[in-house]
Every structure is written in structure tokens, then in C-alpha cells.
Amino acid sequence: MVGFCPHCGSLMRPRESICSACGRNINDDPLDDNIAPIMPKNLTDPKTVEQEDPDLPFFPYEPRPVQVSIIRDIVEAFDNGKHIVVESGTGTGKTIVSLAAALDHASRNHKKVVYLTRTISQSDQVMKELRAISKLRPVCGITITGRGRSCPYLRTLSGYEDMHPSVLASLCEEGKKKYNDGQGGCRYYGGSMGRLKDTEAYVKASHPTSEELDRFCEDRGICPYEVRKMIMKDMDVVVAPYVHFLSDDIRDGFLGNLESDGTDIVMIIDEAHNMIDAAREQESFTIPMTLVEGALDESTTMRGDPPLFENVTLRPFLNELKNSIRSFANDHLSLNEKESILGPTELEDRIMKRFELSKRELDIAIRTLISLGEERTDMLMEKGENRISDLYTLGDLLKDWMLSASDRYIKSINVNDKEESLHAACIDPCDVTRFVREIPGVLHMSGTLQPLDQYVKVMGLSKDCYQRIYPSPFPKENRSVIYLGNVTTRYEDMKRDPSIFSRMEKNIARLCNNVDKNTLVFFPSYSMMNKMMPFLERDVHKDLYWEVSGQQKRTMKALYDFRKGRNGVFFTVMGGSIAEGIDFPGEELCFAIIVGIPYPPPTLESKAMSKLFDEKYGPGTGWRYTSEVPALRKMQQAIGRLIRTETDRGMAVIFDSRASKYATRLGAILSNDPLQDVTNFFSKTQ
């Protein structure tokens, strides 16, 4: 269903080209080839201890009181075989406290720690902390990556980036078979067999990041992908992307390599607020018209017209599917509509009526289509085309479409500028997360996870799971958040009073011009940012930098230049990689302006989820879970960029009167004179 971003390793929606985690196009060259990373300045590692504390055996630093509490609570939950859901503020050391607690429990119970991350890049911090822990106790870990990212043999093949994972697996197996048969094949696989012990010794001694391990292996003619599979069972900690437990097939292979049935592990889910969406995305999929047309083109190259079931042959079946998609678009969508709900079995009913098939007979026809696609794929591979047959891909998706007729999914017909498509969106991920729920001991941790009860309910966790909130230990006086009571981005208000827009723009410009600090301005959407851009470029007299939608390389270059300076303004949107995934320590960021409350625009999926939550948890719950909670998380993430160390000082101004409703959660107070309040804050001695 899904793939991985080649740049950050994140889970991606089917057939998307822009990664929602890092924002980069999957076809871009690696940015690191062009722009050197900025290293945080004036940062010191926590002070390490000379010898272990018997009460905190895997904690290598002098602990803050809150860290002791977190570790004890996690250990207690794990010892009782429970899940624990935690929101942990900046400065609590989420990575190290979770590792220390998990290793404490695992070492006493002969278990392994599985650490799930949203992106591969987040695994680097895990390896750094394992290095620190290893100075107290022997401990080792490894980061698992996909074949497409870490296999050097495949990277020698032209166009490997666009190949289907099944093709990559087939080519990999072919390379190994040829090597074992003495016919050449993959020399990296051969190198892995002869230098396995050396590689394992390096991993246990050096705790390499994913990139460091790849480089070590390739320099020695070893396959990093194969080595990871071979030695992961001997590691104390195994780090992997979410998909390794959301995908049944990948999970089975992962646990097989770990030699585990899932009962002998404890799990840490990092940035857990992303887990539910990742689970939904794992089960959601699209059937585009181009795929149907590709399958039709393939069918014309086949001898005759193969039967799918009795008198139903391939080409009429594919033509009926094409006509059905077209008819759905014409019948369900008005001139300006882009999407419309389909009935749970509307497509199946139409095809069954056309060919006089029962549901069982339609199932047989689709299985036959898949078999034809498998034969076609084998032929393509033998010819060296290295791709999956469109017939196979279409058949596999139709099988999933038939299986997604429950109320856990919403089906729709979509039309964009290019083509029509069918889409099945998972709105209830409880089946996908079942395996995770059954593990006896899982930590769900994030800096922005409130309300915890929402996460517990939607994930389907037991009511007796532990729920904890730990505030940041950093000085409260180092951060200030204010909001304005006379502006809002609410559509109805801005339409009724157009002067709101100009008032916001002038006040944003006024604050930017009078604060001699690096400033981030967060907008609720690209459309509002682009609408205000010409006025801000006219009125703000500083170096200005902009996030550009769909152009991550350009955006990251602008961000790089912004972080090098100390008096620029960077304009971005809430909820993107800059708002969540990048730290700005010290003077890299001191001031943030948040324009509006970023309620997500209503979609078919969000409306269906809202209805589902209202039915399951009570009236009003749906809007809260699908609109209010995501908006607040985005705002908290934006504000959280300000304070990354205990000496950072920062201030945020929210341009929306509706923030009064969330003032307690955001730690915000009403301001009648924002410029004076900002001036007073930054005039205080640090």
C-alpha cells in the first residue's frame, strides 16, 4: 500500500510524490549533497555520572527530578504488563528516559526493546543515547531500514528508486541466488557472509547511526540490509519506522529476524501523536484511472482475451471498471466538486450486475486477475523491465477494495486536474493497531499528546492503561505566550469585516520590524500566507525567507540562510516539517507569530471520522477529535520551537481571539498592547 520517503524514511501515502513528514519530493536528489547542515551552537551535553545509580541503572546523566518520576512510572507500567501514554514537555529528555526505563525492565525480564520512530533521522538520537548508556552498562542497538534505502546492489540498477518493493525484493533474491550458485550475483551479499562477526562487533562497540552503518558496510563490500537482518536478534534495542509494525507482511519478517513472537519485547512509540494517522494511511489506498488504462494496454499485448470467470473475460471486465469510474465521476460530482462519497459496495454491485456475478464469483474473477498479473510480472522481470504488471497491481487493489466495505472505511470518487480515481480511506485504525495493543508493555510518548483520553480511545487501548503528563522543567519565565483579542482568521468574520486582514498584516509587520531577533511567522495555510506575502514583502524591512509548497529544496536553502543570521523573518505554515521536526536552539529562534488557529479544512474523511466519534463517544466528540485537537497540536508544536534548552528565551504572539478558549492549554494571556509586551519581555536581562 505504501512506500518510504528516500530522504527521511517516513511512511508515505500511496502514489504520493511529496513526503508529508519532511516535505521533500521523492524524486529530488539528496539535499545534503548541496547544503551542509547547521550544527546547533552553544549546546552542551548533559553532565554524565561516573557510576550508575542502582535505582536508575541505565540513566547516564545527573537526573532532573521529573526524569526520575518518568522512569519510575514507565518501569512500573512495564513491570505490570501495561501500556503507558505520556505527554512529556521540552527538557524532560524523552529519548533517554524512555530508553533507561525500557532497558531496566527488559534486562530483568529477558526482553528486547523495539523503538518505533516516524522517520529514520529520529533514530540518530537513540543511538547517541545508547553510546552514553554503554559507558555505564554494556548495551547495543541497531537501526532497521528498508531494502530500497540501504541495499548497495540495488542502487547500481538504473531507475531503482521507482521500482516497486516487490521488484526490489525479487532482484535482491535473484542476486543472492546467483551468488550462492557461483554465477556472480550480489558481491555485497557474499561479503556479508564472510564479515558478519566483524560487523556485529563494530555495531556493539560503536553504536552507529543508520548512515554510519551503511557507510561502514559499503566501504567493506558488505550489504547493510542483509547484515541488519542477521544481527538484529543479538541487539538489546532495535529502532525501526512505524510501518514495521503497521504492515502485516513487514511485521512478520521483522519479528522473524528478531526471533520473537511479540511477547518478549517492550515497545517505545516515539512522537506517538503521529501513530494514528500513520495507521490510517497504512490502510488507505487509491485506484487511479491511469492504472486501469495501463492494465487495459497490457491486456492488448496478451494472446487472446483470457477468461476471469466462465464467460467473463479480461478486456470487457477492465472496460467496465473504466466506465464505472467515469460514470461515478459524472453522476456524483457537480462542476466544482472534487470528491464524493460512494456506497460501500457501489462499485462491486455495478460490476456484478453487468456480468451477472455473485460476490463469490466476483472474488474468483479478481483472484484470477491477480494470477494473470503475476504471470505478466514474471515475464516482465525475465525481459529485464524490472516492474510490476499493472494487471497485478490493479487486481491487488480491487481485492483490498472488496475487503474495505466495512464502516472502518469511507469510499469515494475523486477528480483532480489530471484524472479520476477511486479512494478508500481508513477512518478507524483499530484493526491495524491490534498487534501493538496486544504487546505487554508499550510506551506511547510525545511532547504534544493531549488530550490523552482521545489517543487512548482511538488507539483502542485498555481503560486501565497508565496516563501521565509531565511539564517542562525549564524556567517558566523564559517563555511568554500572548494572544490578540481583536483579530481572527475565522472565515465568516473576515468576510464580514475585510479590515481584519489589513490589521493583521500591519501588526505582523510592526512586530517583525521592532523585534531584533530571528522570527518565525506561522500561517494556518499556504493560501493565506501567499495572499499576505506581497504586503509583508512591502512592509517588513528585514531579510525575509519563505517556505514554498512542494519545493522543499528551495525551502531548506532559505531555512539554512535564515538560521545562519540573527535578525531575519521566516514565513511558514503550521503542521509542516519546520513546525514539528526542526530544532532552533539559542539565538536561532527567539520570536514566533502564529496567525490564526489551524483548524483542518473539512474533508470526506474528517466528516466521516467526526460522525464515527460522535456515535462512539458522544455528541461533539467528533469535532473535538478531528478539528480542535489537531489544531491545538499544531499550535503547541509551533510554540515549542522557541524553547529547546534550559537557557533559551522566547515569546509567541497568537493573532486570533479564539485562542481565549485554549488559553490554559497554550499558557497564553490576552494582550491589549502586543508590541509593548514583546518589548518588555526581550528587555529583561537573561
Language-model features: where?
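A substrate-engagement module of RecA-like helicase motors
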Residues: P40-F58, E62, N109-V238, L246, ...
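Walker A/P-loop NTP-binding motif
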Residues: D73-E76, T95-N109, K128-A132
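Walker A/P-loop
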Residues: N80-S98
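Signature of the SF2 helicase/ATPase Hel1-core->accessory helical subdomain module
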Residues: S98, D104, S121-D124, K128, ...
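A contiguous, basic/glycine-rich beta-loop/short-helix subdomain that forms a polymer-engagement track
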Residues: E211-M235, L246-N257, A365-T488, K495-S499, ...
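Conserved RecA-like P-loop NTPase helicase motor core
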Residues: G485-S499, S549-R658
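Conserved interdomain hinge at the start of the Helicase C-terminal
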Residues: T489-P524
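Conserved helicase motor "Helicase C" RecA-like lobe of SF1/SF2 P-loop NTPases
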Residues: P524-V548
